[in-house]
Amino acid sequence: MDSISLLPDDFLLRILSLLPTKDVLNTSVLSKRWRYLWKLVPKLQYSLIDKNADHGTFVRFVDRSLLLSMAPVLESLHLKLGRQCSEVDIGFWVRIAVEKGLCELDFDYEHYKTEPCRLPQSLFTCGTLTVLKLKNVSLKDVQFPVCFKLLKTLHLEYVIFLDKETPQKLLSSCPILEVFDLTRDDDDVDNVMSFSVMVPSLQRFIYCGGSGAELVMNTPSLKYLKLSGCGYECMIGNLPEIVEAHVEVACSTDDILTSLASVKRLLLCLPTEPELPTGTIFHQLEHLEFCSCCTEWDILMFMLKHSPKLRSLKLNETHGYTIVSQSDPMFHWEEPSSVPETLMFVLETLEWRNYRGLKMENELASFLLKHSRRLKIATFSPADCKQVRIELRTTVGMKYRILMELARLPRGSAECELVFG
């Protein structure tokens, strides 16, 4: 302990900031110097989700440690609470943190079939916040306008709004917002049928939506986009700055793909028979990951045909086959009448994960290897033999057969190295 005590305060505070506040306070018994050091820790973490925990003791502990905090700036407050904590206590803690110049709030309210938590109005006029993360919170009673002049990161998970206008009022109060992560429930549980994201400064947007909703986007500075979920409609404006996108949706896709014409890295997992855009060319696309779980291979051929700079292609059964029958479109593939020029002149890397060696897969693998004249490396990783569904299991014997079949396939590139992962 003597050697640790010789370390400078700044270094010790960085270490203590990584610990839950309860553990930080326990260090005060180590020495006289440590007795007051915990009061300067700029990051505080509190958690009470155990139903059997002593609620009164926890409340007194949080009250005391927050009130005694002497950090010049309260960098972050992380609250993970259950419904045994009242809104009165929670509001008191948040108000104290705001008064201490709070920079980051991560509020996770664990509830089950109960009303989401309401937070004090003072939070929504906190001029020092740069990061705000809310889970299971109600914004019905928030009085607008609000002010988040320094907020750059906003996470909303299962948040309830007053009406469809509330989200845009909130976002318009964040003039320099760069990161927005939004998770919604099904239907109109959050009281917003059409969610509008109109943020000129936004650079990163992650959206997970349920069914029966609509997403409208106008984010011209966006560089990263991730869309997941099913049953919602998307209307997306032009994204001239987009660099990377993950699209895993079961909804109308032509508008989405059209807006991603400038993307450089793209992951696609689309429904069967998707709507494909007419005339869209992915001039900047260099890396494509294509999910093979439940989509038709015509989509892949479409992407190869319209991506003249594609250097890397990855195929991956991310979610597992949802249908196993001879009528499943995944079990049928017809060779196109013409070979995409991307295969002949550009593609350098091919990776296929969870390869099962199905007749259709073998035909597609043969087509890709045969016509990829610039291919440098092709990696095939057989599917896991521990699949719960018997019909999808790949035994050791099957893996050996698969690898032998792949090794015998002709390759259009003399430099192509075949790797079995």
From Swiss-Prot:
Signal peptide segment: none
Alphabetical list of SUPFAM superfamilies matching this protein: F-box domain, RNI-like
Domain F-box residue range list: 1-52
SMART domains: FBD (SM00579), FBOX (SM00256)
Gene3D superfamilies: 1.20.1280.50, Ribonuclease Inhibitor (3.80.10.10)
Family annotation (PROSITE patterns): FBOX
Domain FBD: 332-382
Classification via PANTHER family: EMB|CAB62440.1-RELATED, F-BOX/RNI SUPERFAMILY PROTEIN-RELATED
Name used for this protein in its record: FBD-associated F-box protein At5g56370
